[in-house]
Swiss-Prot record:
Keyword set, alphabetical order: Endonuclease, Glycoprotein, Hydrolase, Lysosome, Nuclease, Signal
Positions of glycan attachment: N70, N77, N95, N98, N114, N129, N208, N271, N319
Gene behind the chain: Dnase2b
Classification of source organism: Eukaryota, Metazoa, Chordata, Craniata, Vertebrata
Record has Transmembrane helix as a keyword: no
PANTHER family: DEOXYRIBONUCLEASE II, DEOXYRIBONUCLEASE-2-BETA
Protein name as catalogued: Deoxyribonuclease-2-beta
Catalysed reaction, written as an equation: Endonucleolytic cleavage to nucleoside 3'-phosphates and 3'-phosphooligonucleotide end-products
Tissue: Highly expressed in the eye lens. Detected in liver, but not in the other tissues tested.
Coiled-coil segments on the chain, per record: none
Role, per record: Hydrolyzes DNA under acidic conditions. Does not require divalent cations for activity. Participates in the degradation of nuclear DNA during lens cell differentiation.
Amino acid sequence: MTAKPLRTVLSLLFFALSGVLGTPEISCRNEYGEAVDWFIFYKLPKRTSKASEEAGLQYLYLDSTRQTWNKSLYLINSTRSALGRTLQHLYDTHNSTNDTAYLIYNDGVPGSVNYSRQYGHAKGLLVWNRTQGFWLIHSVPKFPPVHGYEYPTSGRRYGQTGICITFGYSQFEEIDFQLLVLQPNIYSCFIPSTFHWKLIYMPRMCANSSSLKIPVRYLAELHSAQGLNFVHFAKSSFYTDDIFTGWIAQKLKTHLLAQTWQKKKQELPSNCSLPYHVYNIKSIGVTSKSYFSSRQDHSKWCVSIKGSANRWTCIGDLNRSLHQALRGGGFICTKNHYIYQAFHKLYLRYGFCK
């Protein structure tokens, strides 16, 4: 038996045993169903007009056990994809006892034709219990559905990114405040009353409370279940500057290359007006023969420019545009070497300041 089939059999055996021995721990999962501390996906844009089962559904994958991007084993709309495996925790909560919480937010709700501009542009999902859980931050509109895994057909055309991080329970007290600042459009949630004495804001947001005072912005230090350090930048609609130029670059003390959706007549130009500059990425290369324009890419990430003393990578849910400077949203950043190298080698060209 080859390594890949053997690994698949072992992962299936693990889940079979978990049904007997107890519920598997809530964590990010790889394509074999194995728990990982974190993973990142980069869904590639649809680059052909021809009908194809795979077009717009392939993705690059990186996790805490790897050192570089890998082509996914499955398409992103498969329940065997890393997202499909991980989100099974969400769908299992519908059949569990009241010991698991979840919260889903997106300004584009699955099945709706409208977008909620009164809320933040934030997109994400949390599932957790009193031991640990995960936070998925992503750029995909109308995702995920509440009752079963599907990837939206509207998400095939453009590139998309997301990061899943496994956190111990204590970190959800920090995330609780970050969610308040983001002003998320929560379209499904369940938080058992046993969580309420530790979590102040998420239960009230889940109950659609209108009496919450929203801070302008907040920076939180977070630590994954296995100890990887992150910082999370959360801004509300009351912070009306470009989050990249006005805050992230200056706080991290690094020049940034930023990839966000470059929609015509809405993008902000590269900015060198402050001590630390932000340059718009113009094209991305997966291989020497496979590349695409940032206009085909709905992903949102930035990375320190080559030669920087501080080598940061950030992934989030806001574009560099005038409209989104007025929306809530955020970015989670890390100095992990392998994440930095993986993203830094993707950019092909960026725009200089005028």
